[in-house]
Amino acid sequence: TRTIIQSQTLNGQRPAIRQNPSRRQDQWVIGLDIGYSSVKGMSQNTLFTFPKFAKKLPKNAVALAKPLDTDILYRDENGEIYAVGEKAEKMLSIETASDNDPTLFGRNHYYSETFKIAARVGLAMALQSNTYGSPEGKRIVVQTGLPSAYMLDDARYIKEVFADHYSFDLKMGREDWRHYEFALTENDIFVM
């Protein structure tokens, strides 16, 4: 899976959606699918995908490395920094991950650090303003999904994971760090 956070056709910006006639003016609707291998998402003004990997970085790693356009860095409330997406995927080794790692592929991976970071990064990417829209002053609504076999049993878990008060920073490519602070309740999250 490749990270899509840029488009050569739109002056180096991520793909933008010019118009969505079905949207409500008082809501910012986010579609977010956190799969076993990648995160796919869209909002009223953008779409994106990135590999579902997160790797904690040593304290000095960010200052030493020159960022690539596809780099995604996540910083939590405690100042811990994680590489996300392609950057994290490239850092994996045979010793640190396997194709049966329960934090990536387990049946109940919703509470794993990787899942939570991937969800936060996906939400942040969907909350970015551009020429075609802004979430400012709007209720954030998240539509996510589960495999049909898990829908009845797991919908409450995924809602529980998404329902939170968020406060974190995100750095995409060569951009500056950007702070995100917002809250979602279970009433803001829909599962299909």
Regions found by a protein language model. Name each.
Residues 1-192:
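Nucleotide/phosphate-binding catalytic cleft detector across ATP-hydrolyzing
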